[in-house]
């Protein structure tokens, strides 16, 4: 964002990862309990890099674990949620996307009597996932959790109100 405030951070670079067509610098830090935590920094937002003499802890980074329960670009924070979606039978293209996509951990897919695909997954509810649900609201019905359904309804109402403003 060009209008964002400029911030200088000291980070511990661990790995460079390309995810969903975006290049990230993954940096490690120690949380208040002494556990290793990792954050993603988008390369295109990094203006400059300066090397320091500061000692860096040895970080053990596992990309598969870092992106566990994730949908899209963002690595999740907090506890992942159990999510169930119904992909309408009329939306074969979207059903095929779930057939070909790779999730970690694996998602469960089954069909109901009306040939709607029921997808059960455990993931972090991220901005990518919320935007995806909004963009596919006509093809996807949120079965659970109810809190996710309410969040998406509020976002859709807000978007409609903005269009009329």
Cite the ranges covered by each PLM segment:
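Core beta-strand-centered patch of the WYL/Sm-like small regulatory domain
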Residues: 1-84
């Amino acid at each position: 964002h060009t209008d964002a405030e400029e911030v200088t951070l000291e980070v511990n670079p661990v790995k460079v990862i390309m995810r969903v067509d975006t290049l990230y610098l993954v940096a490690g830090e120690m949380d208040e309990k002494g556990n290793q935590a990792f954050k993603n920094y988008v390369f295109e937002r990094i203006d400059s890099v300066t090397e320091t003499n500061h000692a860096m802890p040895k970080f053990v980074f596992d990309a598969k674990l870092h992106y566990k329960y994730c949908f899209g670009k963002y690595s999740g924070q907090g506890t992942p949620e159990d999510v169930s979606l119904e992909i309408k039978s009329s939306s074969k293209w979207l059903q095929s996307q779930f057939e070909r996509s790779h999730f970690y951990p694996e998602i469960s897919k089954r069909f109901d009597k009306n040939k709607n695909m029921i997808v059960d997954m455990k993931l972090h509810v991220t901005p990518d996932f919320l935007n995806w649900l909004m963009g596919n609201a006509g093809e996807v019905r949120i079965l659970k959790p109810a809190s996710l359904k309410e969040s998406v309804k509020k976002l859709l109402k807000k978007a409609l109100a903005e269009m009329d403003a």
